[in-house]
Every structure is written in C-alpha cells, then in structure tokens.
Amino acid sequence: MKVIKREDLGKIIKDGDTVAISGSGGSGSAEELIRGISDSFVKTGHPCNLTVTCGISPGNLTNDEVGMNMLAKEGLVGKAICAHLGMGRVFGNTIGKNQFPAWAVPLGVINHLYRAIAGNEIGVLTKVGLNTFADPRVEGCCANEKAKALDPFVKLVNIEGKDLLLYKSFPIDVAIIKATYADEDGNISFEHEAVIGEQYNMAIAAHNSGGKVIVQVEKIMMKDGLRARDVLIHSSLVDYVLVAEPDTSLGDYNLPVYRPEMTGDKKIALDEIAIRPLDERKVCGRRSAMELKKGYVVNLGVGMPDSVANACAEEGISEDIYLSVESGPTGGVPIGGVAFGGSINPDSVIPTAEQFDAYNGGSLDMCIVGLAQADEDGDVNVSKFGTRVTGPGGFINITQNTKKVIFIGTFTAGGLEEEIKDGKLHIIKEGTIKKFVKNVQQITFSAKNANENNQEILYVTERAVFRLVGLGLELIEIAPGVDLEKDILDQMEFKPFVSPDLKLMDERIFKEGKMGLKI
C-alpha cells in the first residue's frame, strides 16, 4: 500500500481506463479522489475517455462542482454505466445531451455485477428488468442515442422455458472508494460510514481484473490498530491510500460531522425527528402509512416516500415495522433528501449487494416508491423525462419483487399549489404537468409483470388513490374537498375505471395533530 496525494491521480489512472466509483448519492463520496481526477484532466488533458461506473451517482441534487458533476467535462468520460444519475445533475445532463454513450442499469444489477466481475463470471443472469426499458426488446438499458448505436449491454436469454436477462461483465481498471480508516498495512475499515455499499465487491472486482484499488480515508491508524472484525477490505486488495482533508471527508454533503446515530453507535429519541407540516407530502405519507401492518419489512424510495418515515415517527409506530433502504440499512427511520441511503437508529447495516439478494428473493412485504408518470396500463416512469436522464436506481429490483407496491406522489407537477384546511384539500393553482399520461416516456415499472406476478399495486396521491386491475387503473378514493371531474378526471390523459364503491379518503389524513394510527 502506498500513501498518495490528490495530485498523483493523473499518473495512476490511464486514458481509457474503466473506473468504478463508490458512494450512494449524498453519502460516502470519495470527494478528494474524484476531484483529483477532474483537476488532472483540466490541467493536463489526462486521464481522458474514461468509462465510469457507479450505483447512485455521488452528488448533492444540485449543479455544484461536487461528486460526479466534477467529471462532466467534455472528453474526460467516454462511456458511463450507472444506476442513478439524479444526484449529480450536471453529469446526468451530459448523458441526456448525448455527449457520450451511457447505460442506466438497475442498482441491484450493478452491485451484483461487481460481485460477478470479482468472481470472473460471465455476468448477472436475472429476471430483473424484464418488460421494462432495461429489456433489450424495449431499450436495453440505453440512456441515450449513442448507446443504442453500440453493442447491446444486456441480452435476452431463455433457460428452461423462462425469459431472463444477461447483464454482461466487464473488467474494472480502477476502484475509487471512500472509507473511514486505513492502518499502516492498508487494511480498510468503515466505522463512520452510514452506508456500507458496494466497496468490498468493487475492490475485489478491480483487483481480480488486474486493476488498482484507491481508498480515501480520514486517518491512517498504526499497524494492528484496527480490529479484525472492523476490517472490510484486506490490505492485499489495496494499492493506494489518500488521507483526505476534513472538508472532503464528509459523511454526506449535508452532514459534515460524524453522526453516530446513523452507524449504530448511538440511539436518539425518535421524537427528536422533525414533524412535517400538514401539506400534500404529509397527506401522501399518511395515506400510504395506513397500508402498513405490524412486522412488515418495508422499503422506502427516494423523494416523497420519506414522508412515510415521518408519519410513522409522528404516530409512534416506527418500532412496529422495519423500514429498509436498498443501500443496506434496515430498522430505524430512513433519512430523505441528499442524505438518502442512511437511517437513524438502524438495527443493521449490510452491504448493498446482500440487501438486493434479500429483495430479489421477495423479503419485502411492501415498498413505497416515487410516482413521476403513470399511464393507462399502469406502467410507471421515474427514470427519464425529455432529455433528462435520472436512471432507475433500485426501483426496478424493488418494484418487480415486492408483494405490495405503493407509488406515491402529487397528482400533477409544475407549479402546483395546494392548501389543507378544515379537513379538506384545496387546490389553489393546478400543476402544469400531468403525471397520469396516455403512455409513459420510459417503462421503469411494468404493470404486465405485476399482473403476471399477482402483486398488489396502489397509486397514492394527495387527491386520489388508484389500484391496478387487469386492464389498467381503478379510482377507489378521492380527497374531501376535490371535484371528481375537474380536479381528477380532467387532469388525466386517459379515463380510468371508477370504482362503484368510490369513497372519500380517511378524514384524519387532512387534520392537524396525530391521526391515532394503529397497525
């Protein structure tokens, strides 16, 4: 193991290398290492034409020069294979603008690919992605036109009469990893990391590909200064270590200090978690929480689903269920926004690949995920809007393999203004963007799969609740205060089935104070 400085990155990483970058959105970004690559390119033009691969791309949901945004320089990246690009918006925009070929791959597949590469396997063979945009019969994971012009990344195969997808392995030349400590030998530990993601499999994948493993740490401990059980990456896998400056060794972009309640080293009272004001997000969170049952294992997606965690904390039912995040934590209360991926008071934190092993096998009782577009068939899009590419993240793995799926979001978008008063929903200004459309732009969730798998599917908004039936969406509830024709049916590009038993949403959802929710 050799200790390096940021300025050394340009000499270690070569033009055309495939570079795997760890991190989970706002958490665990190897910020100083990424900046070293960017700085070298700006100064010398090298390294260039890199193939970069990541799960949830490091970033803070802005155009700031952080995370993957630092790599959004023309000529630096030649290809990208990522699961989610929404956190690093500038980098995602370069893909939408067709600057270089890119593939948007399910997060569970990316993590399992690192494991397959480490084991010198042909790839990942799975049902995950069938009948979605990942399926080569649809778009084959292509995130832009340049990708469509190249050899397919994923292949449809049939084994014993079953259609499966083969996501093909590729060698990794460099792994870029953030950790907490290294010892003098190069053993690596992750005590301060809220997410133990893909780092271990990524390191072995690079090492077994004949590549290099570079780790950013807070501090180098003396020899034998780490407990063996705390070491997740052995020194034999590590080529270089960089000790980061304090301002680039963040837990995440919004939480610059170590948060022991996110690593299991401390518990805090859940009443310390801020209670949401009574708004449309809270309405959606409360209505979704009403579907929970005691003992459920539940995944919450990024964005509005974090309102469900708030609702559970406010109602005092957080300990009656197990909230799970695809990045690895289970138990406690998941954090939303930039810090998504970590949880407060988690019961366990496991590597992301192992979390997806459980998810793919059906361990989740329910998931609550975002709703950006839904169409008359019940398909959902959360991964592409115009030329803006976000990618699926863990959405496909989760929604395809969970017994009960709830999509949650406002009914329209784009300037929507609403008020909740006197137990009713008042629409002040309608959104300019319809979410319930004739055909979604990209299929991230396949209603065809759901019907074949007998999954229970709900679409929860602040003014209406739908369920998936064999031929499309059925409207089953509307909010008090809204007009069925003007506020719901006229705001859709198709006509749903309207249940003969259509009823009002529970009035408690629209009132101040606790609901008194019991599960």
Indicate where each model-derived feature is located.
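Nucleotide donor/acceptor-binding cores
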Residues: 17, 46-50, 78, 295-296
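Glycine-rich phosphate/ribose-binding loops and adjacent secondary-structure elements
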Residues: 48, 274-277, 282, 286-293, ...
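Conserved S-adenosyl-L-methionine
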Residues: 39-48, 74-77, 315-321
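Glycine-rich phosphate/diphosphate-binding loops and the adjacent beta-loop-alpha structural elements
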Residues: 187, 267-280, 287-299, 304, ...
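Short glycine-rich or small-residue beta-strand-to-loop segments that form or flank ligand, phosphate
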Residues: 18-23, 51-55
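Hydrophobic/aromatic residues located in beta-strands of well-ordered beta-sheets
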Residues: 50-52, 213, 298, 323, ...
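Conserved phosphate- and dinucleotide-binding cores of soluble alpha/beta proteins
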Residues: 2-11, 25-41, 56-72, 76-269, ...
